[in-house]
Amino acid sequence: MSDTEITFSSGDVTLHGSVRVPVSMRGAVPGVLLLAGSGPTDRNGDSALLPGSIGTLRHLADVLERRGFASLRYDKLGSGVTGLGPYEVEDVADLGFSTFIDAASAALDFLGSRRGVNADRLYVVGHSEGALIALTLAQDNPRIRGIGLLEPLAVRLLDLLTAQIDAQLDAVVIAQKLPVQIADELRLALTGAVESLRADGTLSDNLPEPLRNAGLVPANAKALAEEDALDPRMLAAQIDGDLPVLSSASTKDIQIRIEDVDALDDALVHTRLTKLRMTHTNHVLKDIGTQQSTGADYVADLPFSEEFTTGFEAWLKSL
């Protein structure tokens, strides 16, 4: 079935997206809102930062259609046809992470209003950062009947960023490509940046270049501080106990840590939790076999992971 192009509004922004509603002889079908990961990632899961097709969310829509679920995926602000909407580049600093949460909530409303979609059976499936938004939407929200957390952001954002930068610094020091003293100076500057964001939501404009390249610039400060304030484990602990939840993680994912997702699962133990653990799947849910993920494999012409797809379909069947 082909996608139907749609638009919906959130605040001053008109968001562009795609809806699929399978034809069913049994009446209205359940609907799933698909939420993309971080950065300029569009409705299909493709990123403006990576040349080539990734297609993660498009694949999820295909699987959902096979299982009789409607889906909505959209170009979030800063991506795809939506672009920056009514904003100029200089306006970005005034936009917080709540902008993306509000858009997801509006998308859920829109999906529930579509003809052929059962508004009493709405689900949210988020990939990476999208999982954090799914957890946020699920707080005291009886409209949502289940959530999928796929390769999720499982710790506070700045904790993850710190761990990632620490690992990168360790690697270049071991390879003798960076003096220990400079690495220590970068770590000290990073600690100060995190403390500033958590204290008053600001960032210095003279941080070292490697930290600025990692996104630690004043224009991103508000969004970073707002997102970091959302602790995935605290949100998970507050979810209704009867909610079906899928949590997926792979040992080949270089953007998350299995132990972090395990800790998130501990906070979800009171829910109807399904854990999906994988060994051949990269962050964008492609099968990389026994090779190591480098990030270049995200846009490689690889099949989507059968170990993921089989587990995802089994979870959908249980709903």
Model feature map: region roles:
Residues 254-260:
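Conserved alpha/beta-hydrolase "acid-adjacent" motif
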Residues 24-28, 32-63:
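Short, surface-exposed "cap/lid" segments of acyl-processing enzymes
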Residues 284, 290-319:
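Catalytic active-site module of serine/aspartate enzymes centered on a nucleophile-bearing elbow/loop
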Residues 1-27:
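N-terminal cap/lid segment of alpha/beta-hydrolase-fold proteins
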Residues 106, 110-116, 120-169:
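Primarily recognizes the serine-hydrolase "nucleophile elbow" in alpha/beta-hydrolase
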Residues 247-249:
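Short beta-strand/loop motif that positions the catalytic acidic residue
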Residues 148-238:
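Accessory cap/linker subdomain of secreted extracellular hydrolases
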Residues 92-114:
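Alpha/beta-hydrolase active-site loop
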